[in-house]
Amino acid sequence: GLYAAGVIALPGISFEIIQVRVSDALLPMSMVFGLPAVVGLTIGTFVANMFSPFGVVDLLGGTLTNLVATYMAWKMARNFVFKGAWPFIAFLQVLLVTFVVGSYLYVLIGVPPTQLFGFVVPGIVFSWLGVFLGSVVSILLIGYPAAKAVARYLRAEPRYV
């Protein structure tokens, strides 16, 4: 519910090449809440992407991407025991979302080569960059600290977050 509400309420920044999907800040919560978060966020992504202008590709592609990102984070957080594991795992979520979502948005939108800081950047790179920057903000700068704070509050924080 919360994931879908955030996306539906902010469609202008949730469904574009340059996007900050604020609801993706919930993805690192799978490291805290495990399988219930994986299931809830996957269902929330599916519901949210029913409103996507990119149809079934975003509906299935985005949902499967977030399923893999949250499942991977849950499993890795349980098994990685080194300092800095949680931010590393959150960064892997950023990379997964960047390359999968950025790639299919590039194909669906047909992003042309774009002038960026005096350089011509291939459309696929521009697409990845747009999704990457937004994902860093939502997942790494908002989501990871929120997950860490919740884990600390619940006293579920392992020493390697």
Model-derived features: positions:
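Hydrophobic transmembrane alpha-helices
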Residues: G1-P36
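Small-polar-interrupted transmembrane alpha-helices in polytopic inner-membrane proteins
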Residues: L2-Y3, L41-N49
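Membrane-embedded alpha-helical hairpins and interfacial helices in multi-pass inner-membrane proteins
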Residues: V7-R21, V47-V161
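N-terminal, well-ordered alpha-helical segments
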Residues: D24-L27, L41, T45, T70
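Membrane-helix interface "capping/anchor" motifs
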Residues: S30-L41, R78-W86
